[in-house]
């Protein structure tokens, strides 16, 4: 089945990561998955939540949001509504879990890294782009802490990234854009570490159930895409640091 954007079934959209995008943040990137664009920042806060006071470890938490005109029709700001949607809370918890999976909180010391992911243009895959970009922002925030001799050891244990896969008209597809995501039979978000450990697999049969064999095919396809993302993360971090 040809994809309307001329990609092959197992081909990612063009991915770009621009570091140091926000001047004031200890770590920041603009990440682009095709036409999806997300600003990710990592801010160092010299305190921990009350439940961790005196525990000798740090914390990482995340917030996620979409600009009103990041979509085809203007959305009302959640701040104007007075509460966050269930979707927003689900996504920001996912981002936090994903990044904590590769972070040694004891080496971070009693401080918090606050991740903020703001979608400025949405075309599918905003949560996966947020995780992949936020990891690079986290690396820069940790780099700041080490350069300032606030911490001595690197608390980051591995890379982490995320990608979507799905089944549309019986065909598995990698890295769904909005048109594909809104019409697919199955939608899967896969979060994985650089050593190929699974952090999270979110899968839903939208219209037609999927088989165990199809799940394995989608996971293999996701792993292929994630390898590309890990390579890009490494190159981005190395290039800007040299």
Curated annotation (Swiss-Prot):
UniProt keyword Membrane, yes or no: no
PROSITE patterns in UniProt: RIBONUCLEASE_PH
GO molecular function, one term: tRNA nucleotidyltransferase activity
Main EC class the enzyme belongs to: transferase
Enzyme Commission number(s): 2.7.7.56
Gene3D superfamilies with a match to the protein in the record: GHMP Kinase, N-terminal domain (3.30.230.70)
Superkingdom, natural source: Bacteria
The reaction(s) this protein catalyses: tRNA(n+1) + phosphate = tRNA(n) + a ribonucleoside 5'-diphosphate
Family per similarity comment: Belongs to the RNase PH family.
Protein purpose: Phosphorolytic 3'-5' exoribonuclease that plays an important role in tRNA 3'-end maturation. Removes nucleotide residues following the 3'-CCA terminus of tRNAs; can also add nucleotides to the ends of RNA molecules by using nucleoside diphosphates as substrates, but this may not be physiologically important. Probably plays a role in initiation of 16S rRNA degradation (leading to ribosome degradation) during starvation.
Protein name: Ribonuclease PH
Lineage: Bacteria, Pseudomonadati, Pseudomonadota, Betaproteobacteria, Nitrosomonadales
């Amino acid at each position: 089945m040809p994809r309307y954007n001329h990609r092959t079934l197992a081909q990612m959209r063009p991915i770009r990561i621009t570091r140091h995008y926000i001047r004031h943040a200890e770590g920041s990137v603009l990440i682009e998955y095709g036409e999806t664009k997300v600003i990710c920042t990592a801010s160092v806060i010299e305190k921990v939540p009350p439940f961790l006071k005196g525990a000798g470890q740090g914390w990482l938490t995340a917030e996620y949001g979409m600009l009103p005109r990041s979509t085809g029709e203007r959305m009302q700001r959640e701040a104007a509504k007075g509460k966050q949607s269930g979707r927003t809370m689900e996504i920001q918890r996912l981002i936090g879990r994903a990044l904590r999976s590769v972070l040694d909180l004891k080496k971070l010391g009693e401080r918090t890294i606050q991740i903020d992911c703001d979608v400025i243009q949405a075309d599918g895959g905003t949560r996966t782009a947020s995780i992949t970009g936020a990891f690079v922002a986290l690396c820069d925030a940790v780099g700041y802490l080490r350069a300032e001799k606030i911490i001595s050891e690197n608390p980051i244990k591995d890379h982490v990234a995320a990608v979507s896969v799905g089944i549309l008209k019986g065909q598995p597809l990698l890295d769904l854009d909005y048109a594909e995501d809104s019409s697919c039979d199955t939608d899967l978000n896969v979060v994985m570490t650089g050593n190929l450990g699974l952090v999270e697999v979110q899968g839903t049969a939208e219209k037609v159930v999927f088989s165990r064999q199809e799940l394995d095919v989608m996971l293999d396809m996701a792993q292929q895409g994630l390898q590309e993302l890990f390579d890009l993360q490494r190159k981005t971090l190395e290039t800007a640091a040299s």
